[in-house]
C-alpha cells in the first residue's frame, strides 16, 4: 500500500494535478494524510488571531501553538479535510474524512519544552501545544481501508493531557507509512527536490547527505525522513511537485 501526504499549499490545486499530473490512481488507492498551512493562515486572519512564527536554534521556522492558536489550527485542519474529501468524492473516490482525534487514531505527546531564538537569545517555551507522534492505531485504520480511502488531518491526540495537538503533517505521513508497512511514501508538494536549478529525478537514499546543501526547511526535512523511511523498509519515497518528480530509493 501507499501513504500520500498532500501539502497544504497544493490543496487548492488538486483539480489541476488530477488532470495534468495523473494522480488519480495514486490518491484512489492510498491512505491520505494532509496539511493545511494555507487554511490556518486564512482562518487566523478572519478570526483576528495573531500567530507568532518562531525559529528554532537549528534554523527551522514553526508556529507557536498557544491554546487560542490550537483552536484555530483544529478548525482550519477540519476545513481542509472537508475540502479534500469533497474533491475526491466528486472524482468517484469513497473518501473518508478523519483526524487523529477520531477513535484516538493518532496518539501524540505534547512537547513540554521547545526552544526558540528570540531577539538573539535562546528562550524556553513551556506552554506550546505542538507534539510528537507516539502511536498510529493501525487496527482502526485498516477498518477504514476496507470501506474506502482514509483522509487524515494532521491533528494528534494526547490522552494524558486530554488535548488535541498540532503535529507536523510530513511526520504524520511518515509514521503512518511505517506503522502500516507501506511500500511507498508519496509527498504531493508544490515542488520536487531541486539541485543547481534542476529537478533531481532520481536519488539513492545513501547519497542524500551529499545533496542536503541544496535543501532548506521543509525539503531538507523530507529528504532526511526519506532516508529513514528507506532504511526502515519502505521501497520508494516520491516527492511530486508542480515542476516534476523526485524518486528516492
Swiss-Prot record:
Catalysed reactions, semicolon-separated: [amino-group carrier protein]-C-terminal-N-(1,4-dicarboxybutan-1-yl)-L-glutamine + ATP = [amino-group carrier protein]-C-terminal-N-(1-carboxy-5-phosphooxy-5-oxopentan-1-yl)-L-glutamine + ADP; [amino-group carrier protein]-C-terminal-gamma-(L-glutamyl)-L-glutamate + ATP = [amino-group carrier protein]-C-terminal-gamma-(5-phospho-L-glutamyl)-L-glutamate + ADP
InterPro entries named in the record:
AceGlu_kinase-like_sf (IPR036393), AcgluKinase_fam (IPR004662), Asp/Glu/Uridylate_kinase (IPR001048), LysZ (IPR037529)
A Pfam family of the record is AA_kinase
GO BP, one example? lysine biosynthetic process via aminoadipic acid
State any GO CC term: cytoplasm
Q: Where is this site: Transition state stabilizer?
A: 5, 222
Report the subcellular localization.
Cytoplasm
Group of enzyme by EC: transferase
Q: Where does substrate bind?
A: 63, 166
Q: Which UniProt keywords apply?
A: Amino-acid biosynthesis, Arginine biosynthesis, ATP-binding, Cytoplasm, Kinase, Lysine biosynthesis, Nucleotide-binding, Transferase
Q: In which pathway does it act?
A: Amino-acid biosynthesis; L-lysine biosynthesis via AAA pathway; L-lysine from L-alpha-aminoadipate (Thermus route): step 2/5; Amino-acid biosynthesis; L-arginine biosynthesis
EC id: 2.7.2.17, 2.7.2.19
Alphabetically, the GO molecular function entries are: acetylglutamate kinase activity; ATP binding; N2-acetyl-L-aminoadipate kinase activity
Q: What is its main location?
A: cytoplasm
Function, please? Involved in both the arginine and lysine biosynthetic pathways. Phosphorylates the LysW-bound precursors glutamate (for arginine biosynthesis), respectively alpha-aminoadipate (for lysine biosynthesis).
Q: What's this protein's family per the entry? A: Belongs to the acetylglutamate kinase family. LysZ subfamily.
UniProt protein name = Putative [LysW]-aminoadipate/[LysW]-glutamate kinase
Amino acid at each position: 500500500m501507499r501513504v500520500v501526504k498532500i501539502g497544504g499549499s497544493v490543496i487548492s490545486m488538486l483539480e489541476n494535478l488530477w488532470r495534468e499530473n495523473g494522480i488519480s490512481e495514486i490518491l484512489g488507492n492510498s491512505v491520505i494524510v494532509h496539511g493545511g498551512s494555507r487554511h490556518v493562515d486564512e482562518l487566523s486572519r478572519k478570526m483576528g488571531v495573531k500567530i507568532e512564527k518562531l525559529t528554532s536554534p537549528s534554523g527551522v521556522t514553526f508556529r507557536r501553538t498557544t491554546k487560542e492558536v490550537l483552536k484555530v489550527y483544529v478548525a482550519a485542519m477540519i476545513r481542509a479535510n472537508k475540502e479534500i474529501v469533497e474533491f475526491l468524492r466528486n472524482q468517484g473516490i469513497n473518501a473518508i474524512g478523519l483526524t487523529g482525534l477520531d477513535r484516538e487514531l493518532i496518539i501524540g505527546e505534547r512537547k513540554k519544552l521547545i526552544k526558540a531564538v528570540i531577539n538573539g537569545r535562546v528562550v524556553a517555551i513551556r506552554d506550546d501545544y505542538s507534539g510528537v507522534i507516539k502511536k498510529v492505531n493501525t487496527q482502526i485504520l485498516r477498518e477504514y481501508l476496507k470501506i474506502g480511502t482514509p483522509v487524515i488531518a494532521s491533528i494528534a491526540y494526547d490522552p494524558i493531557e486530554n488535548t488535541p495537538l498540532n503535529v507536523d503533517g510530513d511526520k504524520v505521513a511518515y509514521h503512518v507509512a511505517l506503522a502500516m508497512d507501506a511500500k511507498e511514501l508519496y509527498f504531493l508538494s508544490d515542488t520536487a527536490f531541486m539541485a543547481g536549478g534542476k529537478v533531481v529525478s532520481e536519488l539513492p537514499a545513501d547519497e542524500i547527505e551529499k545533496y542536503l546543501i541544496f535543501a532548506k526547511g521543509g525539503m531538507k526535512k523530507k529528504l532526511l525522513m526519506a532516508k529513514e523511511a528507506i532504511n526502515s523498509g519502505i521501497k520508494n519515497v516520491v516527492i511530486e511537485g508542480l515542476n516534476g518528480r523526485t524518486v528516492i530509493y
